[in-house]
């Protein structure tokens, strides 16, 4: 059949990773712990524009250590969460459990909301937000701090591509 929708799947409790390809969504044989994590996460749902960040503009206009620290924190969080927006795409080749799919998709969505929120803070809190976003790629502290995460994400992506093409067995994916 298809690798996209496994219509020949045997419906039973599935391992979270490296099991049968996903088929018809199965909430009958659900991993209750993972499903409960998803329910708890959904209960905390919020939106990037729930708060007006325009009041931050006067605070960020001040030239002091607190403002500099906040800017560095914003740049780091914004960049890290932007990378985390790729979480589902990176894990998808390995996921074989519907509850885990649902949880990781929601978590990926939340990382997108986080990224959007940091973008909104910069857009509304800084006089020149384009300058802030452009400064990230040359901020050695942010890039150095994120490099191990990006290396791990790149390795995970490469493993996922090879695993999807049956060039690796599941045992080859563990390190």
Regions found by a protein language model. Give the residues of each.
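Non-heme di-metal
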Residues: 2-175
């Amino acid at each position: 059949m298809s690798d996209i929708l496994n219509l020949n799947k045997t419906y039973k409790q599935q391992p979270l990773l490296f099991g049968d390809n996903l088929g018809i969504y199965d909430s009958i044989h659900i991993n209750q712990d993972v499903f409960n994590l998803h329910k708890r996460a959904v209960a905390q749902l919020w939106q990037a524009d729930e708060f007006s960040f325009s009041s931050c503009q006067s605070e960020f206009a001040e030239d002091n250590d607190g403002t500099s620290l906040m800017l560095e924190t914003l740049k780091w969080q914004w960049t890290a969460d932007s990378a985390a927006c790729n979480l589902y795409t990176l894990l998808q080749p390995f996921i074989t459990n519907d509850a885990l799919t649902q949880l990781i998709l929601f978590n990926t969505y939340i990382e997108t909301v986080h990224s959007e929120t940091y973008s909104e803070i910069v857009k509304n809190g800084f006089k020149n937000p384009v300058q802030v976003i452009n400064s990230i790629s040359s901020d050695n502290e942010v890039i150095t701090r994120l490099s191990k995460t990006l290396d791990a994400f790149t390795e995970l992506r490469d493993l996922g591509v090879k695993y999807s093409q049956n060039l690796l067995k599941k045992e080859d994916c563990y390190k």
